[in-house]
């Protein structure tokens, strides 16, 4: 079994890479891929960079070069669920773009033309992630809708619009739907797992800077535990 793991920033992948053995590193198009062993599985970890375009490039290169059986997107997100605290985790039940609008042509809000409205994660990965929750002690995890866009959300007015469009949204971030869309086109099973670094409000920039390392570490621990259950 070969598993690709994608995080946008160094704090989101650092613990994973430090936990790997027998590593080999290759850089393609400025993106570093670290292949090795983790929890008895063959894994490839990459730091994609921030945003949907860089995430799409990294995912395409990962799939074309390494042919993983599964892809896991790990990292931080802004939270929209009152019962979750910073550091808690959202496991994707579905993934959508929140900044796409081609409704003039009959598509749903958030649906890219000629693509599904929602990208559905692999249930084997989701169930393994849910089993992994027990390994994380007091960290809480839920399964929910994760939305993606090329903006850092900290404006209450934008938050209202997003929640009006996606009332069940549990978290938002900047890469997941792009990764999911590439996986969909290549028919590679995926899951998005995000730890909350902020609550998508006026305090988000301060919270994000303060809690990114914590969120990245929690998400990485979740991924490592998930691997044990595959």
From Swiss-Prot:
Family matches, as Gene3D superfamilies: Nucleoside phosphorylase domain
Entries under SUPFAM superfamilies matching the protein: Purine and uridine phosphorylases
Pfam families: PNP_UDP_1
Gene Ontology biological process terms from the UniProt entry: L-methionine salvage from methylthioadenosine; L-methionine salvage from S-adenosylmethionine; nucleoside catabolic process
Biochemical pathway: Amino-acid biosynthesis; L-methionine biosynthesis via salvage pathway; S-methyl-5-thio-alpha-D-ribose 1-phosphate from S-methyl-5'-thioadenosine (hydrolase route): step 1/2
Keyword Amino-acid biosynthesis attached: yes
Keywords: Amino-acid biosynthesis, Hydrolase, Methionine biosynthesis
One GO location term (cellular component): cytosol
Active site (catalytic residues): 12, 198
Catalysis performed (reactions): S-adenosyl-L-homocysteine + H2O = S-(5-deoxy-D-ribos-5-yl)-L-homocysteine + adenine; S-methyl-5'-thioadenosine + H2O = 5-(methylsulfanyl)-D-ribose + adenine; 5'-deoxyadenosine + H2O = 5-deoxy-D-ribose + adenine
Record carries keyword Hydrolase: yes
Positions with a binding annotation for substrate: 78, 153, 174-175
Domain of life: Bacteria
MF (Gene Ontology): adenosylhomocysteine nucleosidase activity; methylthioadenosine nucleosidase activity
EC assignment: 3.2.2.9
PANTHER family in the cross-refs: 5'-METHYLTHIOADENOSINE/S-ADENOSYLHOMOCYSTEINE NUCLEOSIDASE (PTHR46832), 5'-METHYLTHIOADENOSINE_S-ADENOSYLHOMOCYSTEINE NUCLEOSIDASE (PTHR46832:SF1)
Family: Belongs to the PNP/UDP phosphorylase family. MtnN subfamily.
Function: Catalyzes the irreversible cleavage of the glycosidic bond in both 5'-methylthioadenosine (MTA) and S-adenosylhomocysteine (SAH/AdoHcy) to adenine and the corresponding thioribose, 5'-methylthioribose and S-ribosylhomocysteine, respectively. Also cleaves 5'-deoxyadenosine, a toxic by-product of radical S-adenosylmethionine (SAM) enzymes, into 5-deoxyribose and adenine.
Official protein name in the record: 5'-methylthioadenosine/S-adenosylhomocysteine nucleosidase
Organism: Shewanella loihica (strain ATCC BAA-1088 / PV-4)
């Amino acid at each position: 079994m070969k598993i690709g793991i994608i995080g946008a920033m160094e704090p989101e992948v650092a613990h994973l890479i430090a936990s790997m053995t027998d590593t080999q590193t290759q850089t393609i198009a400025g993106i570093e891929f670290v292949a090795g062993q983790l929890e008895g599985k063959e894994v490839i970890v990459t730091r994609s960079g921030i945003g949907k375009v860089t995430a799409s490039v990294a995912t395409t290169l990962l799939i074309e070069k390494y042919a993983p059986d599964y892809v896991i997107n790990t990292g931080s997100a802004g939270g929209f669920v009152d019962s979750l605290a910073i550091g808690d985790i959202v496991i994707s039940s579905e993934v959508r773009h929140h900044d796409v609008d081609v409704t003039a042509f009959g598509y749903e809000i958030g649906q890219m033309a000629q693509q599904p409205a929602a990208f559905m994660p692999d249930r084997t990965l989701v169930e393994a992630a849910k089993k992994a929750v027990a390994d994380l002690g007091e960290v809480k995890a839920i399964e929910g809708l994760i939305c993606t866009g090329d903006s850092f959300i900290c404006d209450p007015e934008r938050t209202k619009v997003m929640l009006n469009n996606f009332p069940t949204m549990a978290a938002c971030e900047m890469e997941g739907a792009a990764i999911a869309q590439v996986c969909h086109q290549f028919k590679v099973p995926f899951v998005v797992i995000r730890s909350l670094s902020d609550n998508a409000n006026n305090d988000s920039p301060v919270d994000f800077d303060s809690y990114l390392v914590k969120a990245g570490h929690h998400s990485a621990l979740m991924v490592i535990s998930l691997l044990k259950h595959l």
